[in-house]
Amino acid sequence: MDLKGKTINFLGDSITEGCGVTDIEANRYDNVIKRKCQLKKVNNYGIGGTRIAYQRHPSQKARYDQDFCARSYDMDKSADIIIVYGGINDYLHGDAPIGMFGDKGRETFCGSVYYLMDTICKLYPNAIHVFFTPAHCFCDDGFSLIEEKPENREEHYLYEYTEIIKKTVPLFGFYVFDLSEELKIDPKNEVERNKYAPDGLHFNDDGHNMLADAVIRCLESIKK
């Protein structure tokens, strides 16, 4: 897909907001993509700490509870491409149960993914819809469980959240790209962590430039 002249909405969390980046204008991944691909416009809807699913118990920081589903209503309706990049905070500190495939309400993660995709398709029918699943981070080896999961939430691994997204995508015709495969940064490797994601989760300026390149490759691979 040729990206030149396109308008892209980016719906995401702290990574999309630019946490860890020292020069937002020059190095946050959406702005890098805009510059490299000669986009018409990028609209950044990233809010740190936010989740796809509804939070049953209020967070200490109220902004964390502005979930993706609610915010999906308030984006630029004229955008050519809608990008959703999230899921890590649902795993790290969301209190919604993971639920079952077939859920359609916002009370579970499964249901929220369905609800979000359904809403985006209805509100932005002429746009190309793309979902990026979480990249590698400090806690995604498939064996480690987070130490302080929300009270009364069952134990699950990060890859299970990713698989739910991948399983739901065919119902709505979204394109999906797994950033744990597409982005060659693994913060569990000390060298890569120090170079690209010092806290094990959020990318620095160099990491955002690599993220931008990965997103560009994925978008350009779409046959449109």
Segments (PLM) and residue ranges:
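Conserved SGNH/GDSL esterase-like catalytic core that processes O-acyl groups on lipids
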Residues: 2, 7-9, 15-107, 111
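Short hydrophobic segments within beta-strands
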Residues: 11-12, 132
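Alpha-helical cap/lid subdomain in secreted, periplasmic
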Residues: 66-224
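Short alpha-helical interface patches
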Residues: 1, 10, 17, 179-187
